Amino acid sequence: MTVSDRWLLPDGVEDILPPLAGRIESLRRDVMDTCQRWGYQLVIPPLIEYLESLFTGTGHDLELQTFKLTDQLTGRMMGVRADMTPQAARIDAHTLGQDGITRLCYAGHVLHTRPRHMLTGRTPIQAGCELFGSGSEAADMEVISLMLETLRVAGLPRLHLDLAHVSIYESLVSDAGFDRDTEAAVFDAMARKSVPELDRLLGECVPGSAGFRLRQLARVSGGVESLADAREILSGASGAIDAALDQLARVADMLNRDFPEVSLGFDFCELRGYNYHTGLVFAAYVPGHGDAVAKGGRYDAIGSDFGRARPATGFSLDIRALVSLGERPFRKAGAIWAPADNDARLEGVISGLRMTETVIRALPDDRETDPSERGCDRQLVNRDGQWVVETIA
């Protein structure tokens, strides 16, 4: 093994150094403080769990993203968490077991087998909130509003929010009666927004059929006006689709009222999380970045696998990515340099200052250190027997 092999990190894995580490931690604290001011209680799930609980209700995508290992105590397969949402659902359904509304928030590292996008690598710092026990639109609005507030705290300008509803695609596919291979191919083409491929797969579908509506729907996206286009395409399709469109319209009206500065859009090809989302889904974007900076939605069925079905909605985001994209000012106050003198009065002054300030104490063998190189803009100086703080010239 060469010397370089000893310090080389795996692809997509990085050390986070000062001052970036300080900016990330500052935002993490502010995001969690914001969530807790909205009534969300902090939970700290374990880094590893048995695969059965990590994959509950999440579909195949999360399994591909999860590092797996064998438990040396039991021989069972375990996984390093790739998403904390299933863990929060387990805590609500089984560990807490509360009736009524439960609000939980979390923040911590997750590990992915492959990077999802260039800003995160394979070790994102995920934060999120989950609201359990309410299937109301008010709960959906609370979660979306909190997500937008956390993005404001992160200093993200000019937000765009896309809304979608899983029931629309789900109902059309059910009515179409595709075989398994065709359904998988249509899903893949819709997720990639490949209109030519959908035309090839569904080109023989007659007007008015579910397949024909899917082809037309893939061409619809944009602002509030696109909702009217979708209504025209989906007119008479099913009661479930009408209800989903009505809900999208109501939520859009509330968002326009409460967040007029956020541009709204509808993306009827949005299928991320289709395997576990059950209703309204949403994703926030910023100009110049193609991936969502935060996303979430309703997932009412996931708790049933833990023995207690509960309506649920929530969102998650990556703190590391937000720091890279945001315009949040970060200015760490300068520290105070204290000499290495063995003086009881100096010890008392340092102890008092450390209640509110950062004090860096010199060591006997670093008397030549320049305090400004250690981030100090002030120093403790003995003036007539009194230790006072003075600005470093």
Swiss-Prot record:
Subcellular localization is given as: Cytoplasm
Q: Which domain of life is it from?
A: Bacteria
HAMAP family xrefs: HisZ
Q: What does this protein do?
A: Required for the first step of histidine biosynthesis. May allow the feedback regulation of ATP phosphoribosyltransferase activity by histidine.
SUPFAM superfamilies in alphabetical order: Class II aaRS and biotin synthetases
Taxonomy, top ranks, is: Bacteria, Pseudomonadati, Pseudomonadota, Gammaproteobacteria, Pseudomonadales
Share what the entry says about its subunit structure, partners included: Heteromultimer composed of HisG and HisZ subunits.
Give the matching NCBIfam families.
hisZ_biosyn_reg (TIGR00443), PRK12292.1-1 (NF008935), PRK12421.1 (NF009086)
Of the GO CC terms on this record, one is: cytoplasm
Keyword annotations: Amino-acid biosynthesis, Cytoplasm, Histidine biosynthesis
Q: Which residues form a coiled coil?
A: none
Q: Does the keyword Cytoplasm apply?
A: yes
Which pathway, metabolic or otherwise, does it act in?
Amino-acid biosynthesis; L-histidine biosynthesis; L-histidine from 5-phospho-alpha-D-ribose 1-diphosphate: step 1/9
Q: What's one GO BP annotation on this UniProt entry?
A: L-histidine biosynthetic process
State the similarity comment. Belongs to the class-II aminoacyl-tRNA synthetase family. HisZ subfamily.
Question: Which residues, if any, are the signal sequence?
Answer: none
From the Swiss-Prot or TrEMBL record, give the protein name: ATP phosphoribosyltransferase regulatory subunit
Q: What are the GO MF terms of this UniProt record?
A: histidine-tRNA ligase activity
Miscellaneous information on this protein: This function is generally fulfilled by the C-terminal part of HisG, which is missing in some bacteria such as this one.
